[in-house]
């Protein structure tokens, strides 16, 4: 069951741009709720409450819709037979040493990435934290505004641009289009 719990951990990390590690591993069963759109009661949003983040005392990210509909129910039902309480951990509910767990899950991610030849890329390595970078990049490619991405990820727009999106060729092309767009060359 440890590997299924690891899968859940990796999926939660990628669901809302979390900082992988203790912010996610310390989520309790009471730290999530479903929000409903007042205009469309069928539109559900999964909101987490994270206490004591790196940058502020409380952060409330929301998960992507696919995760909310398809993956989160699996996570909630994974330990359904156990008598879990609201104060129990959402992920790995029976393991108490969260720092050791963070290291073990991170090592597993690296080992799997190396085995699949995904760990080394563009002259660097891709540890578990790269899931956060990928989250920002994918949202940006889909047209999300940098300010919105930063809000979701509990970071600054400057950090999103300089660290998470990186200076890839395509990002520079997109930046050029936004800045210089329809400028005409004067001959």
What are the residue ranges of the model-derived segments?
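C-terminal catalytic core of Y-nucleophile DNA break-rejoin enzymes
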Residues: 52-77, 86-111
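Key DNA-contact positions within bacterial/archaeal DNA-binding proteins
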Residues: 22, 103, 158
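The alpha-helix within a helix-turn-helix
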Residues: 13, 25, 150
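Catalytic-site neighborhood detector that most strongly recognizes the C-terminal catalytic loop/helix
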Residues: 52-56, 153-178
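Conserved tyrosine-mediated DNA breakage-rejoining catalytic core shared by Y-recombinases
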Residues: 16, 25-73
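Basic, Lys/Arg- and aromatic-enriched nucleic-acid-binding interface segment
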Residues: 1-21
């Amino acid at each position: 069951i440890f590997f299924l719990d690891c899968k859940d951990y990796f999926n939660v990390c990628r669901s809302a741009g979390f900082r992988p590690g203790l912010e996610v591993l310390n989520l309790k069963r009471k730290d999530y709720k479903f929000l409903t759109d007042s205009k469309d009661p069928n539109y559900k949003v999964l909101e987490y409450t994270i206490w004591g983040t790196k940058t502020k005392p409380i952060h409330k990210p929301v998960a992507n819709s696919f995760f909310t509909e398809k993956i989160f129910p699996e996570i909630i039902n994974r330990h359904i037979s156990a008598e879990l309480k609201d104060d129990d951990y959402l992920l790995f509910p029976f393991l108490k040493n969260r720092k050791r767990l963070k290291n073990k899950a991170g090592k597993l991610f690296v080992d799997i990435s190396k085995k699949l030849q995904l760990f080394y890329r563009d002259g660097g390595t891709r540890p578990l934290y790269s899931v956060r970078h990928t989250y920002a990049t994918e949202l940006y490619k889909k047209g999300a505004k940098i300010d919105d991405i930063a809000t979701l990820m509990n970071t600054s727009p400057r950090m999103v641009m300089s660290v998470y999106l990186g200076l890839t060729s395509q990002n520079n092309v997109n930046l050029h289009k936004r800045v210089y767009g329809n400028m005409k060359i004067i001959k």
